[in-house]
Amino acid sequence: KEKERAVKLIHFADDIYAKLATIRFRPRYAVQGDISDCNTYLTPDGNIGFFDYNCAGENVLFADAVMQGWFEAHLMDYGTELTDEMSDRIAREFFRGYREVRPFTDEETAVLPGMYALISAFAKGNNRYAMTNAVKEQDAAKIDELLDIMEREIPAGRKIL
């Protein structure tokens, strides 16, 4: 059963990666990579400053925007437990505002929900390393738990645009 579920998720990921193929080779730009309320400050003259550049580097702007949108919708401290509906609304507002300044291409708009879902699936519960460890340890219960998380997060039909 786990193998069938894993294969389904792998096919979903492969489809998203295929759609991202042309986007991956776009120009890369310097990005902060981790803009949050704890990494920004307001100067006395009203400018916004950034610090904490541990995630800074070069990235395709679209990829950075999707990751930043996910971060804003899931990892920021809003002082309350976020529901899926609240997270989706935050993501919608982030992407609405972002696209007012830098519109997405049709290609980017088409792949964004799937890419967002994929990030969500692997970010919840630190699946990247948790799954690797569970497979190495042949921990069927942990693998099943992580596949459950991934299946809940994978639906690309969430209203984030």
Regions inferred by a protein language model and the residue ranges of each:
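ATP-dependent phospho-/nucleotidyl transfer catalytic cores
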Residues: 1-32, 89, 139-145
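A structural signal for short hydrophobic/aromatic patches embedded in well-ordered alpha helices
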Residues: 6-9, 94, 111-112
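A generic short alpha-helical patch detector that favors 3-5-residue windows
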Residues: 8, 57-60, 86
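Active-site acidic catalytic loop and adjacent metal/ATP-binding pocket
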Residues: 15-63
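Aromatic-glycine-rich donor-binding/catalytic loop that engages nucleotide-sugar donors
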Residues: 50, 102-103
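Active-site activation/catalytic loop segments of kinase-like enzymes and analogous catalytic loops
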Residues: 62-102, 118-134
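All-alpha amphipathic helical-bundle segments outside canonical DNA-binding/catalytic cores
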Residues: 104-116
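ATP/Mg2+ or Mg2+-diphosphate-binding catalytic cores
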Residues: 122-161
